[in-house]
Amino acid sequence: MPKKVLTGVVVSDKMQKTVTVLVERQFPHPLYGKVIKRSKKYLAHDPEERYKVGDVVEIIEARPISKRKRFRVLRLVEEGRLDLVEKYLVRRQNYASLSKRGGKA
């Protein structure tokens, strides 16, 4: 079985030899056909610590490196896309404010 290769944005590089990569995917709703966006964060191994927040990278499936780390960074696709990181942080802040108010907008 081939290994999964995913493309995403580095949203955190605060851990040693590890980056957090946000991968977004789009798919049509099975019944209504509307295109839905879903995102997931993966921990990826970065032994040289050369990838920074905002970099667009490819990650590849690997053997388990730690409890949550199952991917390693394959290559750099694009450098410094901080606009994508800002969009993620704003969305996260909005969700946090909703949870403090009990889910009411």
From Swiss-Prot:
GO molecular function per UniProt: rRNA binding; structural constituent of ribosome
NCBIfam families: PRK05610.1, uS17_bact
Keywords of this entry: Ribonucleoprotein, Ribosomal protein, RNA-binding, rRNA-binding
CC terms in the record's Gene Ontology section: cytosolic small ribosomal subunit
InterPro entries: NA-bd_OB-fold (IPR012340), Ribosomal_uS17 (IPR000266), Ribosomal_uS17_bact/chlr (IPR019984), Ribosomal_uS17_CS (IPR019979)
Keyword RNA-binding part of the UniProt annotation: yes
Source organism, top-level taxon: Bacteria
Organism in which the protein naturally occurs: Thermus aquaticus
Lineage: Bacteria, Thermotogati, Deinococcota, Deinococci, Thermales
Similarity remark: Belongs to the universal ribosomal protein uS17 family.
GO BP of this protein: translation
Gene this chain is encoded by: rpsQ
Functional description taken from the UniProt entry: One of the primary rRNA binding proteins, it binds specifically to the 5'-end of 16S ribosomal RNA.
Subunit structure: Part of the 30S ribosomal subunit.
Protein name, per record: Small ribosomal subunit protein uS17
